[in-house]
Amino acid sequence: MSRHHSRFERDYRVGWDRREWSVNGTHGTTSICSVTSGAGGGTASSLSVRPGLLPLPVVPSRLPTPATAPAPCTTGSSEAITSLVASSASAVTTKAPGISKGDSQSQGLATSIRWGQTPINQSTPWDTDEPPSKQMRESDNPGTGPWVTTVAAGNQPTLIAHSYGVAQPPTFSPAVNVQAPVIGVTPSLPPHVGPQLPLMPGHYSLPQPPSQPLSSVVVNMPAQALYASPQPLAVSTLPGVGQVARPGPTAVGNGHMAGPLLPPPPPAQPSATLPSGAPATNGPPTTDSAHGLQMLRTIGVGKYEFTDPGHPREMLKELNQQRRAKAFTDLKIVVEGREFEVHQNVLASCSLYFKDLIQRSVQDSGQGGREKLELVLSNLQADVLELLLEFVYTGSLVIDSANAKTLLEAASKFQFHTFCKVCVSFLEKQLTASNCLGVLAMAEAMQCSELYHMAKAFALQIFPEVAAQEEILSISKDDFIAYVSNDSLNTKAEELVYETVIKWIKKDPATRTQYAAELLAVVRLPFIHPSYLLNVVDNEELIKSSEACRDLVNEAKRYHMLPHARQEMQTPRTRPRLSAGVAEVIVLVGGRQMVGMTQRSLVAVTCWNPQNNKWYPLASLPFYDREFFSVVSAGDNIYLSGGMESGVTLADVWCYMSLLDNWNLVSRMTVPRCRHNSLVYDGKIYTLGGLGVAGNVDHVERYDTITNQWEAVAPLPKAVHSAAATVCGGKIYVFGGVNEAGRAAGVLQSYVPQTNTWSFIESPMIDNKYAPAVTLNGFVFILGGAYARATTIYDPEKGNIKAGPNMNHSRQFCSAVVLDGKIYATGGIVSSEGPALGNMEAYEPTTNTWTLLPHMPCPVFRHGCVVIKKYIQSG
């Protein structure tokens, strides 16, 4: 049993008696030199590290032979090693305190020098009372090489083992009796240095003993610079010595190992000497093994998990070697007369096509996988299959522009999904304006959906650049039509699309002129500016020579000249392209703004795009100081009717044409009114009730946007103004309002357009005024008004009314719309004294909650609010 290893420091005040340590660790008296193998001789197995200790791997360096006087050695055999003795001429043997009886301290071991090793789980060396040979047993790891170094450590408690390099070989004045040609010397700390900054042990390899024995070798250890953080050192010029990285003070373990256990360092050659000025460095253990960086981590008490990331690579390498040697293969593929022998499991794991094919072949043959299968493929090139198999067995392959298409075609056909992604990723990086349409056609032909959508989106996004290339003039008619007719074609002006169509026809007029009308039909002619339409399109010879083309141009002219009839002219050509800035937007029209206690009217018209959360200005109102008007959208146009200006009730109707961004007068209403409601049913605009010249009016009329005519319909049963009106389930509903007495009218009135009849019910639950109404998911929502924050929900099927969630703000004279399945309440005023609200809030039916949204351009109330599709020019 080995002796107890104590951590306390011990002073050996006298040297040890010289004694001989045999290879097996027993004591002898015939020699004062320890025995090792000099050049290929036997090794001392007793130098193995004790259990629980991490050996200290050292890369040998070469020291010049110091100029010291030779002294005779007690043994002349090849087992002699270099002995380090004190420079003192006399050797005095004294008894050191704490040394057991019979053990004397060698005169070659200086005072305060102790044997040291480094445990695997500590960052400082622990000390032992035993010399190196007493730390071994004969049964400890027999046959182990003598490369484990004995470290002589001073008794300073602040020494920490690390590795670093120095420019010149250090020296030390104390003498140590060492066990191996490689020694490690730990310098002592200066007295003024604190223990928090550790120093490094420098490791050096002594040359083999010369033919004439030396009496002593003296190495002086100079003062060493302190360090605070790991720093890489320069690579030594010596062969076999690599770069050394100095570990930080928080390094775990002995600071010498960063990877797998290293083999013993090669012994130094006798003839090798350290060049003058060459730094001596320690090479760190390498991790570039066949298996890469291996990892061993603790997963429990007494349990460790070993991970070798390089294992799959090595397995593939071995399988590939077997494939090339046709060893253990069980599948033969014959393509174009060439035979390829592979492993069924390997190929089936990468290709769903071959997996299914192998399964069916095994079932049909009834071999049960016991005999080698043979598959003959006639729809594949042998070179392509060879490349695919190379990828399957190695995981790497060189792809270039020459083979990318054929590889992708084969990988897609045989369902090599991983390789398909590689090819798609390669081709994605190769997409340009000059080849994207060709890649698009190729992806469509081979049914590679991922590449198809990628190339399509790329080509649509850079249409102006693609239109300038020659490739677009060479694609087929069907591909050309599919490309330019797409709603997502990114173009700032439809004129560019028209010019591209004309260029494609003129590329080969003999065969393409017959498609002129078909191609012109995909151009959004109504979005071409009227002046360009009259001056350029009308004068094109291709257009003049085709009656069908002239009809398309005339349709665009009518669209510009008859804005009120656009509702009946809805075709694919009148639909704006989405990528050109067309979106469903919320438009705020006019209204009132409160500045202190003073109100003023607004003529500004703005729209909010929820896709990018931006506000855009539109054409301002063509009048000033008008209020209590009603606003409704029909198609993509906005109709503003009635109102009061300078105390005069008006019957004017203005139409905002979204395409041209301007306001135009249309036919007037037959009855002037303000504070009325307007809505759209079956393409016609209805104006309901309101406040006329002589008080409340029950008059109802509707406007035909095609004929630009108004006609009267059945009047309201109860004349009201400032009511809430909407369309739901084929009926028109009017909720509450203000009656002729100036009080809230608790009445619900409904109108059936097909029969031109009204009905009404009175209910105390309906007493709203100054509140809007909208329809969402078959329910009618009445927002704010006299109830401020309240939301009232009416179910037309059941005929009941219930309370909904309150809004975040009290809102009178607000407006509301429905967009993308949500209700948006905009602006309003808290009370008659103000303040006006400059924000919006949205109702989410799935959560039944209201959410505040970013602010509007300014606080506003008594304004109009509608939703249209707006063509917004970028920039």
From Swiss-Prot:
Record-level GO BP terms: proteasome-mediated ubiquitin-dependent protein catabolic process
Disordered, as annotated region: 115-145, 248-291
Alphabetized PROSITE patterns for the sequence: BTB
Comp. bias (Polar residues): 115-126
Feature: compositional bias, Basic and acidic residues: 131-140
Key word Glycoprotein present: no
SUPFAM superfamilies: Kelch motif, POZ domain
Molecular functions per Gene Ontology: ubiquitin-like ligase-substrate adaptor activity
Start-end of each Kelch repeat: 585-635, 637-683, 684-730, 732-778, 779-821, 822-870
UniProt keyword annotations, A-Z: Kelch repeat, Repeat
Gene Ontology cellular component list: Cul3-RING ubiquitin ligase complex; cytoplasm
BTB domain boundaries: 329-401
Protein name: Kelch-like protein 29
Source organism of this protein record: Homo sapiens
